A protein has these predicted regions:
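Conserved NTP-binding/hydrolysis module of P-loop NTPases
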Residues: 77-123, 214
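Conserved lysine of the Walker
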Residues: 50
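A conserved switch/coupling segment of P-loop NTPase cores
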Residues: 2, 12, 20-37, 44-47, ...
Length: 226
């Protein structure tokens, strides 16, 4: 079965270097004991390449996971929107793969902890109630915590305000799966079972990246001149 993907940025085919960081990230994920949830934190200056590394890791390991969820977490509003859209994506997925053919949205809503918040067409009901919004935000976490659903990857990208993500509500309350967090805040390391400080590219990797981009620019210029 193909991996279910939500929000995962396109793979950068010109990605260069970062072998050490990718190896460390794999070591954190693979080194966790059986029954231990794996949480890897990539922290460093803004624009240093944390997101790029997380994207590359996800694409390199797509065959390992049954689902990959990319949650934009720079602001509270952005996180809320991302989780709501992810929940809607999940509802469509569950409906399309419903065992009896015709999806029962009442059952789907109940299983996701959002009873009364999915209409007859499978769309989330717009509710201004804070409790309803919190339930929708927690629906993905609830689904990822279900028995047998253990080979997933959940990425919280750009968690630069550590108050935005609520570990109790937004992290699946189970011992399975993998979470990756990217953040500028060094304090985020306390959230992980392992952390990586991301620094600038090695000199050879930086040169290789420049040459690759220069080659692409030249190809584009040549194509324009033809």
């Amino acid at each position: 079965m193909a991996c279910l993907k939500f929000g995962l940025p396109s793979q950068n085919l010109q990605f260069t270097g970062r072998i050490k960081e990718l190896q460390l990230l794999s070591a954190i994920v693979e080194g966790a004991g059986k029954g231990q949830r794996k949480i890897a934190v990539l922290h460093g200056l803004g624009g240093i390449g944390k997101t790029d590394i997380a994207v590359q890791y996800a694409w390199q390991n797509l065959a390992v996971y049954t689902s990959v969820w990319w949650i934009r977490s720079a602001t509270a509003e952005g996180l809320k929107r991302s989780l709501m859209t992810a929940t809607q994506h999940l509802i469509h997925h569950l409906a399309a793969n419903y065992a009896s053919g015709q999806p029962d949205y009442i059952v789907i809503a109940r299983d996701l902890g959002i009873a009364g918040l999915i209409d007859a067409s499978g769309q989330l009901v717009d509710s201004a109630e804070s409790n309803d919004q919190e339930r929708v935000e927690g629906a993905l976490s609830k689904w990822l915590s279900m028995d047998g659903n253990d080979m997933w990857l959940l990425v919280f990208d750009n968690v630069d305000d550590l108050k935005v993500v609520d570990k109790t509500r937004h992290f699946p309350q189970c011992s399975s799966g993998t979470i990756i967090i990217t953040s500028r805040r060094r304090g985020s390391v306390h959230w992980g079972t392992g952390s990586i400080q991301v620094e600038g590219l090695e000199k050879d990797d930086a040169l290789s990246l420049l040459l690759t981009r220069a080659s692409l620019d030249q190809e584009q210029l040549n194509a324009t001149g033809e």
